[in-house]
Amino acid sequence: MRRRPLLLTATAALPGSALARPAAEPGRKVLRLAFQSPETTLDPVQTNSDNNTNTVLAQILEAPLGYDYLARPARLLPVTAEALPQVSADGRVFTVRIRAGIFFAEHPAFGGRPRELVAADYVYAIKRFYDPRWNSSDLYLYESLKLPGLSELREQAVKSRRPFDYDREVDGARALDRYTLRITLGVPDPRFTYLMADPVQMGAVAREVVDFHGSDIGAHPVGTGAFRLKSWRRGSQIVLARNPGFRGAVYAGQPAAHPLAQAAAAHLAGKRLPLVDEVVVDVVEESQPRWLSFLEGRYHWLEVPLSFRAQAAPNRRLAPYLARRGITLQSQLRPDIVMHFFFMQHPLVGGYTPDKVGLRRAIGLAFDGPALRSTYFQGYGLAAQSTVPPHTSGYDAAYKSEMGDFDPLRAKALLDLYGYVDRDGDGWREQPDGSALRLVMASGGSQADRLSNEIWKRSMTAVGLRMDFEIATWPELLKKSRAGTLMMWGYSWTAGSPDGGFFLAIAYGPNASESNDPRFELPAFDRLYERQRLLADGPEREALMRRAKDLLVAYMPFKVHLHTERLDLAQPGVLAYWRHPFMRDLWRFIDVPPAAD
């Protein structure tokens, strides 16, 4: 799963001189893209679920499984595995055979010799999430599965203050022989195979490379994937080059009947991957230079910035001036949530007593979500009724709740009911004990963030609540959130798999300070979460997920605003591009024209 900045932009633009189309070596195919926010690190255990970072890593690292690029609904395929895993009858033991003859990209740590991928590399990659040295915020993905022996290894390292013992074998993750990987869960999980398809959470990492670079491993990712890192200017540009040792797989999936899937499959037939020699990713944080650069031909495709949707697709149709240039348009509802959370341990907005719950509900009802959707999101997107997004299990289009309501009158009534009233006549409400009431929302500093803040300020003022803003960068806010020093903050979560259970896991008590940023802890919710995760998808699981969603609406640790809609533009000559709702490692399938002489 991936965190994204709330409104998809951040704080600064590249200098104008950087926006000219760069020269490329004649005949080479160079895919050119732009990110709207900077990456964090290129170490998979330290990404903090950052969307852009994980997207880059997914081109470099490989998991045993992956998604069929052109299949809809999503379907799993073996990647480095010979076949899909064998699963025990109780849903706890997953055994997979890694294909022989797959090699890591060249690196000095290998001493000039080819380094074959083996099952032990996956065991090592999993163990790194448990190593206290790396303090991984994504550890919860494994901890919740209770892999036998791994938490104990971590606890031993913490208590002894000694290095994590990677050499000790445990049942949770074990190499049975050179190519056979066995993962044992402490609790059944019918959807664990989705984690086995995540190139970041289960991408193979070579121990020699980590030992070689030590604490600087975040700048030196090495994997078995189609691309390798060629250069990296932090927060500015990432360049990936074709991995010359890549095995040159071909697309062998089952494409959907959709015309885009059929056209892509026809183009990919028999072609060895990747189709491009290089990928250049610029970080262009402000939307205008990103948009203008696409129009100038610098980038091969672009997720249309929200502020330019009216220019790109008036009335949801591709603008004629773009169509005449051969540019094409794709749209898709994201499996995501745009939300803000309340830190549940904060003395003002946290807590589980009726007055604190009433305050959070009032804030949620007072926020003008329709204004957010109609202004910044240009009317695109779907009002959210729960934390569970479209395209995932547990999502119900007919589910309706207070989460999607904008009702200032009801907000005022709740505030009055619980004693949040204006006692001194200055126009601002005080707390029930008469002390000052001042909300503080954490935020980035971009123009997009300022727009969101204006809506928050106006909404809160309308019901008599003061609101100030704490401005910081995206990485700084991530750190503060993990440290529990924010009162309120907002961002987006994007699904990494079809399992909607993750969007309940962000409120699961044991995940506090990891994915559970509000540190919500409610035993009744935790029991529902634990029960649903053991069940296969079906009516019984759906019913439990609905009850869990009801509790999140009632206690309001999150105010979820909407599920966003993505618009992609592609330049003429871009072939085999069809956005997948979950798959990140798709750059190897994209084809672009070679550079002209």
Predicted regions located by residue number:
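N-terminal lobe/hinge region of extracytoplasmic solute-binding protein
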Residues: 34-90, 222
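Active-site-proximal polar cores
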Residues: 561
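N-terminal export signals
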Residues: 4-21
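Short, well-ordered beta-strand segments
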Residues: 31-34, 440-442
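A structural "hinge/loop" feature
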Residues: 37-56, 80, 108-111, 137-138, ...
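Extracytoplasmic/periplasmic ligand-capture domains
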Residues: 21-25, 69-70, 85, 93-136, ...
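A short, structured loop/turn motif at beta-sheet edges
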Residues: 88-90, 176-180
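Surface-exposed intrinsically disordered loops and tails
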Residues: 148-162, 167
